[in-house]
A protein has these predicted regions:
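Conserved hydrolase catalytic core segment
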Residues: 77-89, 98
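Post-His helix in hydrolase/transferase enzymes
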Residues: 167-181
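Active-site catalytic motif of lipid deacylating hydrolases and related acyltransferases
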Residues: 2-61
Length: 185
């Protein structure tokens, strides 16, 4: 068993995006993995939680989770259902507020509710975590991100006016995110 944590990236509903910070970081962080994209039931919360569980089951040793957007909600939902020793930290970057309306092109609150995404769990996470929130994220207000961080027992970091930390917001690479992940290793 290895003692160096493995980084497991947990993408949001867009799954794998070539010019996303998670994709760039995965290439730079040796031995890291990414939860596999779903072939079917892409909006199913349960299917995504099970995909995370399968990815974790394939990793021997400690793990750092690096989640973005709805991936943060997958981590939180997973923690309600499963326990795994050795999760040494979780970066929850730009969590998506699945209880509030999202911009055009994203699922509606009703679609998300029907797919099991609501309500958002508000119990403390059983491992150390950090919510990194943008002051101008169109998918989650800064106030809501701060509220969720408190509920989850997460440290909270204001990363500035960086939108949703995705390609439409100008991210490709996100050096600060990579540094936050490395700090958990």
């Amino acid at each position: 068993m290895t003692t160096t944590p493995t980084v497991l990236f947990v993408p949001g509903l867009r799954d794998h995006v070539d010019d996303h910070w998670q994709t760039h970081a995965q290439k730079k962080i040796h031995g890291s993995h990414c939860v596999a994209p779903l072939e079917h039931d892409k909006l199913s919360r349960d299917a995504r939680v099970e995909a995370l569980q399968a990815a974790l089951a394939a990793i021997d040793g400690p793990v750092v989770l690096a989640a973005h957007s709805a991936g943060c909600m997958i981590v939180v939902q997973w923690a309600q259902k499963y326990r795994r020793d050795g999760i040494v930290g979780a970066l929850l970057a730009a969590p998506a507020d699945v209880e509030s309306p999202m911009p055009a092109g994203y699922p509606t609150v009703e679609q998300l509710a029907a797919a099991g995404w609501t309500p958002i769990p508000r119990q403390p996470l059983p491992f150390p975590s950090l919510v990194a929130a943008s002051t101008n994220d169109p998918l989650c207000s800064f106030t809501r991100a701060e509220e969720l961080a408190r509920a989850w027992g997460s440290r909270f970091l204001d990363v500035g006016a960086v939108g949703h930390i995705n390609p439409p917001a100008g991210f490709g690479e996100w050096k600060q995110g990579e540094d936050l992940i490395r700090d958990m290793l």
